[in-house]
Amino acid sequence: MHLPHDAGPGNDDYLVSRRQAWFAFAMTFGLMLFDYIDRQVIVSLFPYMKADWALSDKQLGGLVSVISVVVATLGLPVALLADRFSRVKSVVVMATVWSLASITCMFTRNYGQLFAARALVGAGEAGYGSVGAALIASLFPRRLRSALLGAFFAAASLGSVAGVLLGGAIAARWGWQAAFGAVGIPGLVLALLYMAVRDYKTVDIQNATQSGTQQSVGTLVRRTVSQLAGNRTLVWACSGAAMQLIVVSSIWSWLPSFLNRYHGVAADQAARQAALVVLAGAIGGFIWGTLVDRCALGRAKLRLAIVAGLCLLTMAIFLAAFGLMAAGPAQFGLIVLGGFVMACTVGPISAVVFDVIHPAMRATGAAVLSLAQNLLGLAVGPFLTGWLSDLLGLSTALSLVPLFGLLAALAFVRAMRSYESDMQAVAGIRVSAD
C-alpha cells in the first residue's frame, strides 16, 4: 500500500480546509480547557475539605495524583485504539465519561467515595491530550506545530486557572461539593459538538512496523511499544518533560494552600491569587512555544537547548522564592515570574515528539509522552509535596521540589544528541484527510 507523505518543508499545507482545521482546533482546545477545569477545581477546595473531613496533606495530594495515575495507566491503550479506529469518536466518549464523573463527585459523602469518583474522572481523561494533540499536529502545517501545540496545552493552564477560580467562588457561596457539579456540565455540551470535527485517515500500521503480514493485537502492541522504546529522542524528551511537570504540578496544586497558610489570606482570595500564577503559565506556554519555533528554524537541536535553559531558570526562581524569601508581595511576584517560565516544555517538547514519530503512531507516541508526564510528573508532584509537607512543612516542601528542574534540563541535553537523526528517519511520510 502506498503511504502518502506528511507535510514537510516543501509541502507545508493544511490537511483540510483552514475553516475545518481551526474548528477542530477550537473544539479540541475547548475540551482540553474543561479537562483541566474538572481536574484542578479540587485544589481550591483543599482548605474546606481539610476542615470538613480532617484530611492530611498527603490525602489531599492523593485526590490530585490519582487522576494522573489512571491517565498514565489507560492513556497508552486508549491512544492505540484511537490510532486504529477513530480519534474523533474516541474524544466524544472520553469527554462524556470525565464530565459525568466530575458531576458524580458532587454527591460523594466521604474520602473513599470521592477518591473513586476522581479516579473515574482520570479514566475519562486518559488519552485525550495525546489524541487531541495528534489531531492538531496532523491537520495543521508543520511550521505551526509548536505554537499550536503550545496553545493547545496552554488550555491546561487556562483550565486550571478557571478551575481554581470557579472552585473558590462556588465553594464560598454554595459549598465546596457544588463546585464539582457546576464544572462538569459544559464538557457534555462540547462532547456533542465534537462530532462535527473532521478526522484524518488512519495510516496503515503495517507500513510503520515495516511488515506486510497480518498481525495480532498483541503483536501489534509489542511492535509498537518496541519501536517507540527504541526512539532515543522520545525517551529522553518524555523523561525531561516528566521531571519539569513535577515542579509544575506541585505549584499548581499547593499554591492556594501555601498562600492561605503563610500569607494569611482567605481560601477564596488564595484561589484568586494562585490563579494568577497559573494564568502566567498559560501565557508563558504559548509565548515560549512561539519563540522556540522561531529560534529553532533551521537549527532543530536549539529547540531542546532553549527548553533546557528555561528549566534551569525555573528552578532558580522557585528556589529563591520559597527557600530564601519571606512571605509577602515580593515573594509572590517572584512566584508569578516562575509560573510564567515553568510551562516552557509544553509546546516545544510535544513538537519534538511529533517530529520523531511515524504518523501511524502519532496518538500512541503522544500517549507515551502523556504516560511519562502523568505517571512520573503530574502524579508525583502533588503527592510528594503533600508528603513532604506533612513531614517538613509546606514551605520547605515547595523549596525542595524545584530541584527536579535540573534533572529535566539534563534529559533535554541528552535528547539533543539523537533529535536530528530520529527526525530524518520519519521525514517524507505523509497523511491525508479522512
Where are these regions (language model features)?
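Juxtamembrane intracellular "pre-TM" segments in multi-pass secondary transporters
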Residues: 10-17, 201-238
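Extracytoplasmic gate region of multi-pass secondary transporters
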Residues: 42-43, 232-286, 346, 350, ...
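Helix-breaking motifs and short loop linkers at transmembrane-helix boundaries and internal kinks
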Residues: 54, 86, 107-113, 124, ...
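Conserved MFS/SLC helix-loop-helix module at the cytosolic interface between two early adjacent transmembrane helices
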Residues: 73-109
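Cytoplasmic membrane-interface "Motif A"-like loop-to-helix N-cap segments
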Residues: 84-95, 294-310
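C-terminal ends and interior cores of transmembrane alpha-helices
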Residues: 96-109, 312-326
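Cytoplasmic helix-loop-helix junction between adjacent transmembrane helices
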Residues: 117-157
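Helix-loop-helix hairpin linking two adjacent transmembrane segments in secondary transporters
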Residues: 152-202
